[in-house]
Amino acid sequence: MNRPRPVEKMVGIIKKLPGVGHKMAERLSYHILKMPQVEVDRLIDSIQNARRTMKCCSICCNLSEHDPCPICSDVTREKNIVCVVETPQDLIAVSKVEDYKGLYFVLGGALSPLDAVGPDDIRIDKLIKRLKRDSINEVIIATDADSKGEITAVYLADIIKILGIKVTRLGYGLPVGGDIEYADEITISRAIAGRKEM
């Protein structure tokens, strides 16, 4: 027996989320159907509210309710150092490290030739414009330690060095192939402290 068409449509939409396969999408769909209507309404409202209120910071491209975001607006932060991350989730992970007091830039992804993601598909041009405009002395590249993150790091380092800006990469402590957003605060803190010049 086939699933009813409305359930099939839910499964098709939910499995488009990152990390959600067909079976998980099916479980989530049936779970949502069993939820009390008030909970379903709250879920829908929270999604719509987040979509409506969240903005991309015009300076760092982080998601925020305000533009500029609270980090870019914080006058106590070091304005001459920028940590470049792939996603807002990575920014949140690094920002939990109290040792780092600089600013951020969210690329919105990583270079991936196999997936046809090139420099024009992420915010590299916007980053370079910011680096030319602001008085930045150092860029910490905090992309993931997988092949996409490494390709992105090398590409960025080559471009940024031409601007005469010091480029460093997070030091050891992050597992090869690992995502920054899943690393604990101590690991990220050690990686920042042990960053290497590129």
Curated annotation (Swiss-Prot):
The yes or no answer to whether the keyword Zinc-finger is present is yes
**What's an example Gene Ontology biological process for this entry?**
DNA repair
An example Gene Ontology molecular-function term: zinc ion binding
* InterPro entries to which the protein is assigned, alphabetical: DNA_Rcmb_RecR, Rcmb_RecR, Rcmb_RecR_Znf, TOPRIM_dom, TOPRIM_RecR
Q: Which SUPFAM superfamilies match?
A: Recombination protein RecR (SSF111304)
Q: Where is the Toprim domain?
A: 80-175
Reply yes or no: does the keyword DNA damage apply.
Answer: yes
Cite the Pfam families for this sequence: RecR_C (PF21175), RecR_HhH (PF21176), RecR_ZnF (PF02132), Toprim_4 (PF13662)
What are the residue ranges of zinc fingers typed C4-type?
57-72
By sequence similarity, the record places it as follows: Belongs to the RecR family.
The protein's matches in NCBIfam families, at most eight in alphabetical order, are given as: recR
Protein purpose: May play a role in DNA repair. It seems to be involved in an RecBC-independent recombinational process of DNA repair. It may act with RecF and RecO.
Name the record gives this protein: Recombination protein RecR
Organism in which the protein naturally occurs: Endomicrobium trichonymphae
